[in-house]
């Protein structure tokens, strides 16, 4: 297991972008934050408030799914207790959530993409399916997760998405 964790750390370190300002780093920062839970809670709240008969149940299903997934992620994180990679960026994450496994961001974005595939509309599903892996990779690029964290998050988010589709199927 130790060798696997060392390989994970080496691969993750290769994926990191420089700490100095630049276009790639700026894009990675925006992508990494676009999966933040507060952003999605606010957006889904607005969608429910302003949306019509299609969007209101959509927003509630996604919100309830995100909340349930967050609880599962927290239980796993505080059971495994894997420390985040060392680094400068993400001080808020490092203080409020020092554990990296699994990536809650990766789990959340995959869950959202799968729900969009199931509920539609299809153009949104396509956009979210492109966006989700970019968010997850940006988390590694910014140094707040290891590659295995986002892989586990993807698996967890996909499983949660399939379950949520069964629960919220119309």
Residue ranges and their predicted role:
Residues 89-170:
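Membrane-embedded catalytic cores of phosphoryl/pyrophosphoryl-handling enzymes
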Residues 30, 45-46, 63, 129-133, ...:
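Residue-level signature of the transmembrane alpha-helical core
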Residues 1-41, 73-100:
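N-terminal transmembrane-helix/juxtamembrane module of multi-pass inner/ER membrane proteins
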Residues 63-78, 125-137:
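Small-polar-interrupted transmembrane alpha-helices in polytopic inner-membrane proteins
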Residues 44-72:
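Interfacial segments of alpha-helical transmembrane regions
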Residues 48, 72-81, 117, 165-169:
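Membrane-water interface at transmembrane helix exits
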Residues 35-48, 130:
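Hydrophobic alpha-helical transmembrane segments
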Residues 21-24, 53-58, 85-86, 120-126, ...:
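Membrane-helix interface segments
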């Amino acid at each position: 297991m130790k060798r696997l964790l060392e390989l994970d750390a080496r691969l993750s370190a290769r994926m990191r972008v420089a700490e100095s300002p630049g276009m790639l780093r700026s894009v990675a920062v925006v992508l990494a934050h676009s999966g933040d839970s507060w952003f999605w809670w606010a957006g889904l709240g607005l969608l429910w408030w302003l949306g019509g008969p299609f969007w209101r149940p959509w927003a509630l299903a996604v919100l309830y799914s995100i909340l349930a997934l967050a609880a599962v992620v927290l239980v796993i994180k505080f059971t495994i207790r894997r420390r985040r990679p060392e680094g400068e960026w993400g001080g808020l994450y490092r203080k409020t959530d020092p554990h990296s496994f699994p990536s809650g961001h990766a789990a959340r974005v995959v869950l959202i993409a799968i729900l969009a595939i199931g509920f539609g509309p299809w153009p949104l599903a396509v956009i979210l399916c492109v966006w989700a892996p970019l968010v997850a990779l940006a988390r590694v690029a910014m140094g707040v997760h290891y590659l295995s964290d986002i892989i586990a998050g993807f698996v967890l988010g996909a499983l949660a998405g399939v379950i949520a589709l069964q629960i919220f199927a119309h």
